[in-house]
């Protein structure tokens, strides 16, 4: 009789990034493919999480918006309305 051991699949997580006073916090996030990043905007004006030539998430004032990560890699993002706001996502395979 053979014994088979299977690892349970990793559960996807939701990682919160707060936006307050024109700052992404934390500015650097490590995540896995399948995780969701949720940006929570505490400011009174809209922001974006934008990758040049890639995706853009618009986060309305006093609201949240999210994105599920589909590919591994490292990307820098910024707010299109406030270009000094910057963040970095490092996404690895599960």
Where do the model's predicted regions map?
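Extracytoplasmic copper-binding redox domains, predominantly the cupredoxin/blue-copper superfamily
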Residues: 2-94
